[in-house]
Amino acid sequence: MPKMKSHRGACKRFKTTSSGKIKRERMNGSHNLEKKNSKRCRRLHQTALLEGLKAKQIKRMIQA
């Protein structure tokens, strides 16, 4: 049976940390920032960690 291919879209959007957690970028932080307040803009430029079932699903898509 051939090897399963990893999901290329998921590979581009998610990264794994050295401890195995899944890291992602937040949405809505690239343009139209003049409408958003400073606190929101700062928060949108931080990375977020996935938890629970979603992290498990993404790991399967990336590692396949």
From Swiss-Prot:
Pfam families: Ribosomal_L35p (PF01632). GO terms for molecular function: structural constituent of ribosome. Keywords: Ribonucleoprotein, Ribosomal protein. Disulfide bonds: none annotated. PROSITE patterns: RIBOSOMAL_L35. It comes from the Bacteria. The keyword Ribosomal protein applies. The keyword Ribosomal protein applies. GO terms for biological process: translation. GO terms for cellular component: cytosolic large ribosomal subunit. InterPro entries: Ribosomal_bL35 (IPR001706), Ribosomal_bL35-like (IPR021137), Ribosomal_bL35_CS (IPR018265), Ribosomal_bL35_sf (IPR037229). Belongs to the bacterial ribosomal protein bL35 family. PANTHER family: 54S RIBOSOMAL PROTEIN BL35M, LARGE RIBOSOMAL SUBUNIT PROTEIN BL35M. This is Large ribosomal subunit protein bL35. The lineage of its organism: Bacteria, Pseudomonadati, Chlorobiota, Chlorobiia, Chlorobiales.
